[in-house]
């Protein structure tokens, strides 16, 4: 499909236009019409009802929901995607509440500073949805996309969305969405592109502590960071003053390898090799909580069970329902930005780390391989990393 740049979509929204926002194929894999409440024109909701044909909802921030005492529609939300519906509403000035103009009045009242909870009748014909506070960086839904887009256009944190259905009542996807885009002259973006746009703008790590850390491989400084998005704790082991081009090892936590010296992998040996290199040449190790390439400790142990039954490290993850590698390097890039590191000599054998850093604006100027000895227990694992995952070993 042909997608537009986020900046072009923002400009369209500020002109009062609707845009199409497409989510991931592993999620709903659908397109929603999205408009910003503050900027939408008088025909927006009528267009959504006539051409979109889906349920018209009003994504809002948590603060707006609290302001108007909009409580969850149900006590126990069993929606497959966790969509946070509140009780439906009509503005007191509307007639039946269902007309496009009544729903437009209700939506606009949600961003009126003078509106009060008493101005809304419940239930009604407009369905507010409460967005997660960290937007698409926390939940990749159309609800969060609409509120994030509103904020990016400097508008009140509220929007209007409607699923796009075909004339036969089926959901529009793929080529059907592209045809809809061209038929109506709309901009179309993906939630994935909005996530990346937000990550580029995000400063979500905060330094919490800094201490001296003597180790078997030299004396370092250890920095403790916290992600404001996930509340994860990240440590950085550093030697010397940060440089514009820095020696950097991005190491994914491996309890079994780093702590218990498991011979199933090469993680512990790579960490020790990196510490020796950084102690001699200066630089930093960013230690990310990405156990099992992002699937977590217990799932990694479950993957080991499958490996004992004949799977390799890639097919085991796939058999458990995960991608082969779930890691993202947004937080690593944020930490490098904190230290004003613009480019790196990356201590790694993994090309995906080069791509992951580049995606967030960090240039990989050079690479230093980390070569460690194989053993009888990790030979197949190392071979799979080389052949299936493209590791340069």
Curated annotation (Swiss-Prot):
Binding of Zn(2+), residues: 254, 265, 267
Keyword Lyase: yes
GO cellular component: cytosol
Location of the active site: 325, 327
Keyword Magnesium: yes
Pathway info: Cofactor biosynthesis; riboflavin biosynthesis; 2-hydroxy-3-oxobutyl phosphate from D-ribulose 5-phosphate: step 1/1; Cofactor biosynthesis; riboflavin biosynthesis; 5-amino-6-(D-ribitylamino)uracil from GTP: step 1/4
Binding site residues for Mg(2+) 2: 28, 142
Pfam families on file: DHBP_synthase (PF00926), GTP_cyclohydro2 (PF00925)
Binding site for D-ribulose 5-phosphate: 27-28, 32, 139-143, 163
Keyword tags: GTP-binding, Hydrolase, Lyase, Magnesium, Manganese, Metal-binding, Multifunctional enzyme, Nucleotide-binding, Riboflavin biosynthesis, Zinc
Protein name per the record: Riboflavin biosynthesis protein RibBA
Organism: Staphylococcus haemolyticus (strain JCSC1435)
